[in-house]
Each structure stands twice: as structure tokens, then as C-alpha cells.
Amino acid sequence: MAAMATPQQCWLPTRARAPPPPPPRAPSSASPVSGAPASLRFRGRRAASASASAARRRRGASLPCSPRCALETAGPGFDPLGLYNDGPSRNDTQSPLSNFFGVLSPVFGSSSGGRKEKSYGRGAAAAIEDSSIDIGDFFKGPLPGKFLKLLGYLALSRLGIYIPLGGVNRDAFAGNLDQNSLLGTLDSFSGGGIGRLGICSLGIVPFINAQIVFQLLAQLYPKLQDLQKKEGEAGRKKVLQYTRYASVGFAIVQAIGQVLFLRPYVNDFSTEWVLTSVTLLTLGSVFTTFIGERISDLKLGNGTSLLIFTSIISYLPASFGRTVAQAFQDGNYVGLLTIILSFLFLVLGIVYVQEAERKIPLNYASRYSSRSGGLQRSAYLPFKVNSSGVMPIIFSTSSLALPGTLARFTGLEFLKKAAISLNPGGALYIPTNVLLIAFFNYYYTFLQLDPDDLSEQLKRQGASIPLVRPGKSTAAFIKTVLSNISVLGSAFLAVLAAGPSVVEQITHLTAFRGFAGTSVLILVGCATDTARKVQAEIISQKYKNIEFYDVNRFDQ
């Protein structure tokens, strides 16, 4: 009958157990791993030392022992580095804390002899651990300088609002502005520039109109679309340059329309005054567009959105003050409370939808987990529910303003009727606005995310969507997902656009019309986008200081 193995002989796994130790008279001539497989031969020196120590304990010898020897003779359950955790546990009474460090030790631990192992997973973990942000991180790197430049650019853009055109009766014009809902909305986008008749009152609107035109032309002319997508950064710069030229033309047309609209309020309407006013308004629009591009270069957010964000913030106190004054004048306290509650729920809903996303899991062929025996599925492809942001609403508002501008420029009767119908409160305002928002949202979503390009990128990276074949099937799947998401996003934006009109009819308060759900969406969207850009900038600075293979830094 075979003798039962002693505990000192069972420190190796059962499937590759070492032979019994040699006789005491020849302890150095044995090799405890002579019958072990190749995967365990790197433990040979340590196994021999452990066998010799066990033999000395059986003989009761009291030989001098080094610190390393003391660690080896500490008992069969002593394994601080977790070198033998692939076999059966030798100590079932270990604490949960010991088990936790035993799991972490193969990643961060050292091999025998005190030599540090190079950890390939520690760099990413360190970057994630160091991604926490405090106030001190904000003042490191180029962020303070970028924010000072941003504040300077925004102050310059606001300066042109307070430089007025000469020879206009502002009081009479302000009274007409309160009665025109669409002009009130555009006035909120310009930060009160239209009401003050500033030289920068056109703002960024001509540039937005030029962007709309070129995005539509890209669908009609394949060469323009190839220039925008296939030629990379150089092609996009060319399209941007063409958009700038077109924005100057739109600025001239809109400036002429605004000057003709101001004719009843001008004291001395002459050709000289018209030329001077058109030139000043056009230069003001070009200057605002230039500032928007400089803000975009700072990579702290979209320059166009930040300019509109600043304008809305500056317009908010006056708009809310008029609403409160009208409510107290009419004694409509219930309507005022309804508007305040609607505003709070609107902000919460916008934040919820803006942060919502559809996550599509991805499989990477190069990421095979030997422990789980399959592909890792930690990566995913995120799609925002409202991936187009505030741009569809801005495009829709600018499109609704075009008939009024053309009517003032041409004086055609059918354009005047169309402009009246497309004003907030008109018969065609809500359905036309909803349709335009749905169209621009669908178009802008696929302009930002091309399913064919995404499918090709995933294929090059060795990634695939579970149960979906790479190539055309992946592109079709992504297109279906984006189409479904765009429907939800369009419904959300349509509620934002039409909701204020419904609240206005319920509360009978019209002074708050210029600051609608569109404005709240722009505020929340720009604020969250800028916060993400700042966080990404801070984390990128931390990545620059991380040595991904410097284990000595993390083992202290």
C-alpha cells in the first residue's frame, strides 16, 4: 500500500506533484521538479529549497537561516506573492483580505529573487485611478491660459452688441420686437443684439445658414461629399473655406433685409446710411464668425454653440424679469409657478436624455481571456440618443427666419404671408418646425456617424458586433440602430420646440417666449460638452506623466 504523502510534499498541484524528498545524507542531489511538466520548471530552484527546508525540519536541525530561508520555512500556507494560486488552496482558513491580495498579486507582484515583473495591465489601471479630478488639476497645464483666451473672445463678441447703428428710433423698434415672436427668439440667440441694434446683431446666423446650404449641397453633388469625407482634414478645410465665403454672402443679404426692415424707424433713410449700415452689419457678422473659429481652436467646445450659449445667458435675466413683471401685473401667479416648474422639469429631462446612450457590445479577436476561456466583452460602441445636439434646432430656427428675411428684401406678398404663418403662434409654425427638426436631426446624425465608415474601422481594428457579420451586415445593423435613435431624438427635440407654445397657451404669459426649450437645450448641451472637454484635457495631461511599464512607481 502506497504511503500517504506528507503536507510538505503536497505544496505542488496534484496533477504535477513532485517526487518525495531525497534522503538526509544527500539533500542537494535531488530535483523536486524532475517529473513536472515544462510549465512548472521555472519553480525548480524554489522547490528544491523548500524540500531541503522540509528535510531539516523533520531532522530537527537548528541550522542558521537567512531571511529568505525563514520565509521558506514559514509553513505550507505561506504564499505572500500568490505564486501558487493556480493549484488547490493550501490554507482554507485564509481571510477575505488575503484572498483579495492573492488575486491582485499575479498582476502587481514580484517573482522570486526580488526582481520586478513588467506589468502590461498596470498602465491603464493607473490612468483610470489617477483620472479623479480636483481643483488643483485645473490649474496645471495649459487650461488656465485657454480659459483666459475663451473669456477674452467671448467678451469681444459681446462688445459688438453694445455698439449701435446710428439714426434709428430704438424705442419704437423695441415695441415692435416684443410683438414678433420669431424675432424675439433670434434676439435671444444674439444676446439682445437685434433689440439693441448692435453692429454684431446678425451674430453667427449667416455662418449657420451657409453650413446648412453646404450640407444640403453635399447630398446633391458627390464631388463635394467626397471632398468632405474622403480627402480627410485637407478636404474639410476646403469646405470650411467655401462656407466662410458663402457666409459673407448670407451676411450681406441678411444685412440688407434688416436695414430695409428698419426703414420705418430710421430718422433719415438715405443711400449713404444704407451702405454704411450694411457694411457694419456684414463686418460684425464676419468678426463674430472669426471669434467662433478661434474658440473652436481652443478645443473647449464648439465655437458656434458657445457664442449662442453666452448670448442666451446674457438674455436670460431680462427675459425672466419681463415674465415675472407680466405675471404680477396680471395677477397670474399660477401661470408663473407653472412656468417655473416646467423650466425645472425641462432641465431634468434634457440632462437625462443628453446623457442617455445605446451601448453596442464589441468583441476584439486580439483580446482573449484565458481565465474566462472566451472573448472579453468590456468594450462597447456608444451611440447618444441625441447625438446631433442642438444643431437641428438652430438649423430649423434659421430656416424659419429665411422667409421673413426674403419678404423684407423682395416685398413679395406670398412671402409675407408665409413669414406670418411660420411665426410662433402661426398655423404652420409647429408642424413645419417639427418636420424641419426631424429632417435635420436625421441628416446630421448620419453626417456625423457614417455606418459604412464605422463598419470599415471596426473591421480594421479586429472588432465585431456579436451575432453580426463584419462588413455590409455590420453597416446595415449600425444604420438601423442610428435610424431608431434618430426617431427618439427627433421626438425629444420636437417636444422641446413645441412645448413652450403649449405652456404659453396654458399660462397666457408671452414675455417668456424668447427663452424657450431650445435655449435650455443649448445651455445644457454646451455646459455638458465643455465640462467633458475640460475633463478630457485634464486626463490627457495625466496620461502624459504616466509611465505605463514603470512598476517601481506603484509597488511602493
UniProtKB/Swiss-Prot annotation:
Sorted UniProt keywords: Chloroplast, Membrane, Plastid, Protein transport, Thylakoid, Transit peptide, Translocation, Transmembrane, Transmembrane helix, Transport
A GO-annotated cellular component: chloroplast thylakoid membrane
TM regions (residue ranges): 147-167, 197-217, 246-266, 272-292, 300-320, 333-353, 387-407, 420-440, 480-500, 506-526
Comp. bias intervals (Polar residues): 1-11
InterPro entries recorded: SecY, SecY/SEC61-alpha, SecY_CS, SecY_dom_sf
Biased segments, Low complexity type: 27-54
Pfam families per the UniProt record, alphabetical: SecY
Subcellular location: Plastid, Chloroplast thylakoid membrane
Assembly mode: Component of the plastid Sec protein translocase complex, which is composed of at least SECY and SECE.
Assigned protein family: Belongs to the SecY/SEC61-alpha family.
NCBIfam families: 3a0501s007
Function: The central subunit of the protein translocation channel SecYE. Consists of two halves formed by TMs 1-5 and 6-10. These two domains form a lateral gate at the front which open onto the bilayer between TMs 2 and 7, and are clamped together by SecE at the back. The channel is closed by both a pore ring composed of hydrophobic SecY resides and a short helix (helix 2A) on the extracellular side of the membrane which forms a plug.
Listed name of the protein: Preprotein translocase subunit SECY, chloroplastic
